[in-house]
Amino acid sequence: MVQKAHSFRRKTRKKLRKHPRRRGLPPLTRFLQEFEVGQRVHIVIEPSYHKGMPDPRFHGRTGTVVGKRGDAYIVEVPDGNKVKTLFIHPVHLRPQK
């Protein structure tokens, strides 16, 4: 009998898909983005870069930058009645306008 996969990227067939013209890595400016503490950011996963990638359930969520650890930013995201703390690489973040 087969077992269901419990991998990190399961159920993300459409969520982590890129448009064919956008294939490959994004521009370097996305890697070198700077955010300030208290700034609101959107979590938009970049599927071609795996380091510092948050769980796909947080794709599309908005959080607040709390600090920095190495290259990654510490982002707090409300999840129901709790506030989750995530360590996310800046390539997976976009500033809120």
Swiss-Prot record:
Any Gene Ontology CC annotation: ribosome
Return the HAMAP family for the record.
Ribosomal_eL21 (MF_00369)
GO aspect biological process, one term: translation
Q: Which UniProt keywords apply?
A: Ribonucleoprotein, Ribosomal protein
Which portions of the chain have biased composition (kind: Basic residues)? 1-24
Look up the domain of life of the source.
Archaea
Enumerate the Pfam families for this protein.
Ribosomal_L21e
Name the gene. rpl21e
Q: Where are the transmembrane segments?
A: none
Q: What is this protein called?
A: Large ribosomal subunit protein eL21
Q: What PANTHER family would the database entry show?
A: 60S RIBOSOMAL PROTEIN L21 (PTHR20981)
Give positions of region: Disordered: 1-25
Q: Where is the signal peptide?
A: none
InterPro entries from the entry? Ribosomal_eL21 (IPR001147), Ribosomal_eL21_arc (IPR022856), Ribosomal_eL21_CS (IPR018259), Ribosomal_eL21_sf (IPR036948), Translation_prot_SH3-like_sf (IPR008991)
Family per similarity comment: Belongs to the eukaryotic ribosomal protein eL21 family.
Source organism per UniProt: Pyrococcus abyssi (strain GE5 / Orsay)
Q: What terms describe the molecular function in GO for this protein?
A: structural constituent of ribosome
